Amino acid sequence: MNMLTVLSVNIALSTCLITIAFWLPQLNLYTEKANPYECGFDPMSSARLPFSMKFFLVAITFLLFDLEIALLLPLPWAIQMNNINTMMLTAFILVSVLALGLAYEWMQKGLEWTE
C-alpha cells in the first residue's frame, strides 16, 4: 500500500512537471530566442552547423561499451557469491546482447567512416 502511494505520487508529479516543461516555453515565442548569443553582436555565420551522424553512432557505441565495462567491473566481487551460476549467466547475457548490437551496427556499416 505504501509503495503504491509513493509510486502514484511520483507518476503524478512527473506528469505534472513534463506537462509544465512542454507548456511553458510556448508562452513567449520570440525570434531572438532562436538565435545564438555572440557577446551582443550579430552572428557571423550559422551556429547550427551540420552534425556528422557517423560521429554520433561511434560516440554512442563508445558510451555503450563504456557502460558495459562499468557493469562488468563488480564481477570479481560477485564471484564470492554463493550462486555463481546466476552471476555468470547475467554477465554472459550482457556481453551477448552488446556483441549482437555491435555485429548489427557493423553489418549496417554504421562504424565505417567514409565521409
Swiss-Prot record:
Protein family per UniProt: Belongs to the complex I subunit 3 family.
Subcellular location: Mitochondrion inner membrane
Gene Ontology CC annotations of this record: mitochondrial inner membrane; NADH dehydrogenase complex
Xref: InterPro entries: NADH_UbQ/plastoQ_OxRdtase_su3, NDAH_ubi_oxred_su3_sf
Annotated function: Core subunit of the mitochondrial membrane respiratory chain NADH dehydrogenase (Complex I) which catalyzes electron transfer from NADH through the respiratory chain, using ubiquinone as an electron acceptor. Essential for the catalytic activity of complex I.
Reaction equation(s) it catalyzes: a ubiquinone + NADH + 5 H(+)(in) = a ubiquinol + NAD(+) + 4 H(+)(out)
Organism expressing this protein natively: Peromyscus slevini
Transmembrane segments: 4-24, 55-75, 87-107
Keyword Membrane attached: yes
Pfam family, one: Oxidored_q4
E.C. number(s) listed in UniProt: 7.1.1.2
Topology within the bilayer: Multi-pass membrane protein
Signal peptide per UniProt: none
Organismal lineage: Eukaryota, Metazoa, Chordata, Craniata, Vertebrata
EC top class, as a word: translocase
Quaternary structure (record): Core subunit of respiratory chain NADH dehydrogenase (Complex I) which is composed of 45 different subunits. Interacts with TMEM186. Interacts with TMEM242.
Protein name: NADH-ubiquinone oxidoreductase chain 3
